[in-house]
């Protein structure tokens, strides 16, 4: 008999009635034969890569052409092939600027803004004072700049790398948004597409794979595009897409074996969406293990979230929480029978992680994963306790707990553990206890989730979100609560940018997962993860289904 059928039917459960999977077993059709990368494709990619490398080498560092070339390569999603060259070039560009900044009289907004964004994107602090020359005595940007659409667009993109206290960039953001929106309908199709995409989602807060997929289409329609670069970007995307399709096929088989419909019918069926989350953090060929591990973790998190949120009773959750903290097979007998399949998946996950890390001589990393897991599962029980006792906590108390339940920190630490890079104990400790970027990323994930999901959640018995907490504590309207949540998200992005620019003792590969986890939730317009039949479905189709060579792409 189904274990769920054996559960006491007199118990009232706050079922969420989630829709069935959009994808089902679709990706099982991507067999190893269909996703095989041919020797001809590999050879052609290497030949094109060498030609693009020559373009980079032959273009002088301190030229506008070099800035545009690097920007194009990054947008097309192929910069990972040339990381070292780009790093050195941007360093040279920054050094030259610093040496001559008092003599610098560059009045080309397009160049100044692009250079600013690329330099900050490589973690060099270039002062926002470079934009002062484009303002009047009253600190407002000159209206004559509205004739330079590309300059406005570059300035708009640059503003998203601002840190606290940069009022000139706040002014620049308001100025560029106002004018880009008003002029967009009058632009030619190619420029209109760039402006529309930027206003919808700026580069800095978008995930690299989505940027690449959409920019390939935009770049193809720019008359001055470079055919060689476009061909390279398309082939590279095609090869990575095959690899991602194969991984999705393997993970779909794993998911099918878990028997979701019988063992976890109360939970969302989101395997493909979980993989999308993983690829948003790591898309490169060297990160296959990281994507697989992270996907499995997010699947476990999703089922657990629905268990605590939409099915189990408080009395069932107390022993389950204790069992997860113990992480031992002997705890199995202490939990309800219907919870045991999920607990077994949880144990298998950690066994697999430990086995793989032991091969790498990094078994001690598992300690950090288990510490974060224990914090996470206890925070879920705290939310269940609040719900049981009809407690709406103060905003700060809510955030302390809810930024753990959102699981961002656990995902982040897992990324660092399984990515394959060496990370010192000091770096782990810094990320967990001292960084701005980790708590800021968690806060963005939590508040964005509360903004887009709380109306749906309040239709059933559910714990308070930040919105309800703020309304109660400050006797505010829901609209005022939304405004405050968005203000805190904006400030959290400034914290992320601050660490990215100033935590120079920490390698970039340590910070990028936190940045990408923030980007992932930032691109969701509604509760797309839960109700993934619209925007997220279209995005997944772009990345994993549609051919990049299709005339209807994007």
UniProtKB/Swiss-Prot annotation:
UniProt free text on domains: The Asp-Asp-Xaa-Xaa-Asp/Glu (DDXXD/E) motif is important for the catalytic activity, presumably through binding to Mg(2+).
Keyword Cytoplasm: no
Catalytic activity reported: (2E,6E)-farnesyl diphosphate = (E)-gamma-bisabolene + diphosphate; (2Z,6Z)-farnesyl diphosphate = (E)-gamma-bisabolene + diphosphate; (2Z,6Z)-farnesyl diphosphate = (E)-alpha-bisabolene + diphosphate; (2Z,6Z)-farnesyl diphosphate = (Z)-beta-farnesene + diphosphate
Positions annotated to bind Mg(2+) 3: 449, 457
Similarity comment text for this entry: Belongs to the terpene synthase family. Tpsa subfamily.
Binding site for Mg(2+) 1: 305, 309
Native organism: Solanum habrochaites
Lineage: Eukaryota, Viridiplantae, Streptophyta, Embryophyta, Tracheophyta
CDD domains membership: Terpene_cyclase_plant_C1
Full protein name: Sesquiterpene synthase 14b
GO molecular function: hydrolase activity; magnesium ion binding; terpene synthase activity
Domain of life according to the entry: Eukaryota
Motif DDXXD motif: chain residues: 305-309
Cofactor: Mg(2+); Mn(2+)
Annotated GO biological process: diterpenoid biosynthetic process; terpenoid biosynthetic process
């Amino acid at each position: 008999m189904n274990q769920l059928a054996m559960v006491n039917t007199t118990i009232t459960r706050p079922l969420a009635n989630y829709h069935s999977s959009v994808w089902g077993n679709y990706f099982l059709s991507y067999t190893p034969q269909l996703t095989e990368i041919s020797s001809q494709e590999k050879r052609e990619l290497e030949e094109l890569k060498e030609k693009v490398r020559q373009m980079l080498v032959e273009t002088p560092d301190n030229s506008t052409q070099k800035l545009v070339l690097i920007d194009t390569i990054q947008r097309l999603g192929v910069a990972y092939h040339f990381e070292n060259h780009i790093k050195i070039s941007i360093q040279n560009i920054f050094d030259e600027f610093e040496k001559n900044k008092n003599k610098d009289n560059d009045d080309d907004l397009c160049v100044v803004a692009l250079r600013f964004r690329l330099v900050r994107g490589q973690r060099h602090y270039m002062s926002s004072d470079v934009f002062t020359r484009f303002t009047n005595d009253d600190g407002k940007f000159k209206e004559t700049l509205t004739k330079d659409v590309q300059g406005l667009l570059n300035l708009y993109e640059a503003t998203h790398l601002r840190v606290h206290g940069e009022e000139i960039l706040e002014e620049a953001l308001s100025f560029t948004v106002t004018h880009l929106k008003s002029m967009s309908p009058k632009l030619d199709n190619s420029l209109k597409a760039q402006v529309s995409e930027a206003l919808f989602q700026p580069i800095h807060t978008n995930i690299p794979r989505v940027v690449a997929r959409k920019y390939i289409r935009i770049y193809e329609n720019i008359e001055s595009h470079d055919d060689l670069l476009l061909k390279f970007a398309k082939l590279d995307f095609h090869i990575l897409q095959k690899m991602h399709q194969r991984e999705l096929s393997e993970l779909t088989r794993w998911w099918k074996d878990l028997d979701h419909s019988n063992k976890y019918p109360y939970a969302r069926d989101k395997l493909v969406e979980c993989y999308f989350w993983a690829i948003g953090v790591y898309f490169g060929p060297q990160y296959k293990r990281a994507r697989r591990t992270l996907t499995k973790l997010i699947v476990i998190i999703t089922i657990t979230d629905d268990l605590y949120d939409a099915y189990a009773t408080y009395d069932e959750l107390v022993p389950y929480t204790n069992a997860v903290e113990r992480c031992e097979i002997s705890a199995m007998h202490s939990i309800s029978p219907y919870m045991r399949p999920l607990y077994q998946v949880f144990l298998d996950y950690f066994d697999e992680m430990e086995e793989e890390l032991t091969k790498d001589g990094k078994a001690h990393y598992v300690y950090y994963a288990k510490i974060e897991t224990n914090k996470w599962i206890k925070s879920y029980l705290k939310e269940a306790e609040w719900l049981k006792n009809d407690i709406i906590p103060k905003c700060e108390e809510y955030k302390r707990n809810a930024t753990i339940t959102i699981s961002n920190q656990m995902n982040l630490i897992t990324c660092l553990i399984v990515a394959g890079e060496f990370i010192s104990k000091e770096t782990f400790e810094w990320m967990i206890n001292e960084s701005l970027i980790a708590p800021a990323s968690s806060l963005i994930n939590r508040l964005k989730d509360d903004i887009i999901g709380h109306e749906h959640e309040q239709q059933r018995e559910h714990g308070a979100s930040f919105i309800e907490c703020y309304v109660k504590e400050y006797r505010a309207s829901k609209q005022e609560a939304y405004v405050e949540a968005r203000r805190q998200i904006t400030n959290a992005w400034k914290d992320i940018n601050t660490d990215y620019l100033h935590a120079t003792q920490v390698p970039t590969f340590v910070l990028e997962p936190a940045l990408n986890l923030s980007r992932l939730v930032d691109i969701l317009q509604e509760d797309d993860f839960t109700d993934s039949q619209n925007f997220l479905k279209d995005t997944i189709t772009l990345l994993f289904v549609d051919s990049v060579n299709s005339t209807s792409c994007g």
